[in-house]
A protein has these predicted regions:
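Thiamine diphosphate
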Residues: 2-158
Length: 158
């Protein structure tokens, strides 16, 4: 009887913690949506990546209020996506390039460290690309996407 009661209390505590997290996540998500809408007010802002125009991951819900004219849906080809972002930045746009998982951003590191990172130096200050990179890190709630989709590579980018 005591074990069943203890187990019931533990389950109730887990439920209450999950409910609190839902509330926090909702507030956090709302702030992301507000920031995306604020960025979209500027004519030079372009959103590109996977699931920016069609559902497919949690990031989609943060851009669904943005005008379709400001969004470019892309297939899975991360290196090209970063290259496109750099090209858009050269033309005066501010691309907001979305990688649904940090693991996917790793595939774009060549463009990031060999081109985006060096362009201001190579062009002697003529080009200063402004690119906003969005990704999610280590999400295991509500769905654990497994080891290849929940890694945190933050230290590698420092």
């Amino acid at each position: 009887m005591v074990d069943a009661l203890t187990k019931q209390k533990q389950e109730m505590q887990k439920f209450q913690e999950a409910e609190m997290l839902k509330h926090l996540d909702l507030q956090y998500k709302n702030e992301i949506i507000r920031s995306m809408e604020w960025l979209a007010e500027k004519d030079d802002t372009i959103f590109l990546g996977q699931a920016v125009n069609y559902s497919g991951n949690a990031m989609y819900n943060t851009t669904k209020t943005i005008s379709d004219e400001q969004k470019i849906e892309l297939p899975v080809f991360e290196d090209v996506q970063m290259g496109m972002s750099l090209g858009m930045a050269y033309e005066g746009f501010v691309p907001i390039t979305s990688y649904p998982r940090f693991d996917f951003l790793i595939c774009a590191v060549n463009q990031l460290v060999n081109h985006v990172d060096k362009m201001t130096i190579i062009s002697e200050g003529q080009y200063q690309p402004r690119i906003i990179i969005r990704t999610s890190i280590g999400s295991r709630i509500p769905l654990d996407a497994g080891e290849q989709h929940t890694q945190d590579h933050t230290q590698a980018f420092k």
